[in-house]
UniProtKB/Swiss-Prot annotation:
It comes from the Eukaryota. It comes from Pisum sativum (Garden pea). NCBIfam families: fdx_plant (TIGR02008). It is found in: Plastid, Chloroplast. This is Ferredoxin-1, chloroplastic. Forms a complex with heterodimeric ferredoxin-thioredoxin reductase (FTR) and thioredoxin.
Amino acid sequence: MATTPALYGTAVSTSFLRTQPMPMSVTTTKAFSNGFLGLKTSLKRGDLAVAMASYKVKLVTPDGTQEFECPSDVYILDHAEEVGIDLPYSCRAGSCSSCAGKVVGGEVDQSDGSFLDDEQIEAGFVLTCVAYPTSDVVIETHKEEDLTA
């Protein structure tokens, strides 16, 4: 029985391991690197592929309606800024109400926030600085006054 010394002086048997190579093929296809199941990627050969959802976010602002795709792991406020939408904010940590909005359709995860109480969340209020989309969502923005009224 073949043994190989390992750390701390223990021996590990490798006799059960197959010594002949097994046929296998791993390739990166152009179709996969340009999009898989409708998900947008920017993969290069050797990159690790991680699939995440992206949702349509519609913001109803005093200046009109803005719509964009937002990854499920990015805060709505952050991605809105990335695509050029100016929204109110202050703390960026979910501990004030400057970025308050109201969800009128869809769902968000705002478990990172600490400012809103359960009643406010049930009424549909959201802090865009700590809210991830979990479905396509419509949010009325600039609702700080409604929240504090």
